[in-house]
């Protein structure tokens, strides 16, 4: 059906969302939001509609099914997500993020034409990249969503019920406590605060709407009043502080505004009611990923904004990590309503470019745990929207025989002392060059991400075999090229730690300048990596350095240049192990003395949960405890070492009183001893060991003081 455009606007896309299905017309409707250029409005939108063929229509679920706190309409979400790949406009909007589009729409805001600004032909018929024109992207408008609730688990492993698992040793496959916890959860005492640049909306349960009118009339929204503490574990998260003075109190209608539109199609018409927010991005506190508040708030908001509406309402469809069998690295996903991105990380300024093309965790990434996306080309389309399937296959075959698996970890045994494969010490003055291949490998896959290591981990877990092979080939092409260059430049490789490569040279290096080293590397690598991607992450002269293979899957690195201020490496206890290794490079290293040097940092962070979190490898051999909340649905799940073993935890929860500081101190000492032990074993003499044990007890007492 030909549609005549009456609105022509330009802008950068913010997101594509599923609106609903118009069953009478067999039409799927998407909502596309964008930041318009050259206009006073901060946000604009259009609808993309598509008729569904018989084959696809027969696969549409009859209904969204019964909603839970962690999942609503997952089969409908998967169905519509698969349809996106067959729509050229949707594919362009999701795959060419950061470009300015020209939107042509009819009177009902239905898209009738789309092209990248600067291209002659519309999407689907043109090539080449679009120009920026006079568009100057500004920082998007933020909102912060803070929620608290009390959760009680009557039949799961939450709270004290988790103690029943305390005797199970950590071995084999990791336990997943959240499954039982979310089967029967009771939520109460809900408090919600939304802060924007205009003011603050608050919905403390049962307040009668004094602070805000609530998402559902005067009942305050969802839940009743209470202290907001989670059952079995307190929360350290707090809403961000605003400017001085009393902030403006907002009502829910100040934040969300329904807009009525009419869609005409083949002699039929239907009314639509999208809801426009007073912001572009919502940042939620981490607890909102498991405390059940966010879905209920949006459910009440949708009910309020569509009350007495006789048209086709938006669909509220979502999936949370707790709805995935193994949990997820990806955050919760709202496929449609409320039509903006919800991010579960510290709030910061972002642009439209970042939201569409720069975010490490693409919208809908959590769907990759479900068929038909899991390890399929559909998953690749979500992970790498800018890379075609045939291009992925070509790159998968480009590497030939791969010598290293993705994320290899090893030391150069040719440089290790006899009898040791886990320790490498360079005692003489040398140049140390540290390279990181992750960003270049991601760029070879067409992925522009902030955390390339995390992105590659998601490829390993959820990508297709072709995408995994393409990533492995890119990694091997880079690694073999780097090692070839190193041999020619007089460097020897000392260690490979996943994407990091450590090169040492006791001879005169080709240059003392890191930029010249980078240029020499690029010239050697040829056409493999794309331009403008840095490889050098560190370069300098060292009097000595040490590399230790620890827990079989990580390399700890100590450098003499870090001796002047070892605590600067201690952003976490895990990082303190590198600082401890640096301290073994002194003239007369003493284990107890090294521990004493680290104590100021340990003491300063003794109440900070995030500082003491470790991955599961550090909990090996200790009895495992369930978390007080279903936080293990967020993968990979970190742990705390406690008196009864190890407990799965989250940085948003307060540090428990039974943290086993002695276990952390002992692990630090073990690391130091391994770096100092001579080939063939041996250890401290009796007097030195007694002194170390005495210091261990003393330091444990200091850290345990409130």
From Swiss-Prot:
Residues 203-249 are annotated as: Disordered. Residues 217-236 have a biased composition (Gly residues). It is found in: Host nucleus. The keyword Ribonucleoprotein does not apply. Coiled coil: none annotated. Keywords: ATP-binding, DNA replication, Helicase, Host nucleus, Hydrolase, Nucleotide-binding. InterPro entries: Helicase-primas_cplx_Herpesvir (IPR008650), HSV_HEPA (IPR004996). HAMAP family: HSV_HEPA. Associates with the primase and the helicase to form the helicase-primase complex. Interacts with the origin-binding protein. Interacts with the polymerase catalytic subunit. Belongs to the herpesviridae HEPA family. Component of the helicase/primase complex. Unwinds the DNA at the replication forks and generates single-stranded DNA for both leading and lagging strand synthesis. The primase synthesizes short RNA primers on the lagging strand that the polymerase presumably elongates using dNTPs. The primase-associated factor has no known catalytic activity in the complex and may serve to facilitate the formation of the replisome by directly interacting with the origin-binding protein and the polymerase. This is DNA helicase/primase complex-associated protein. It comes from Equine herpesvirus 2 (strain 86/87) (EHV-2). The lineage of its organism: Viruses, Duplodnaviria, Heunggongvirae, Peploviricota, Herviviricetes.
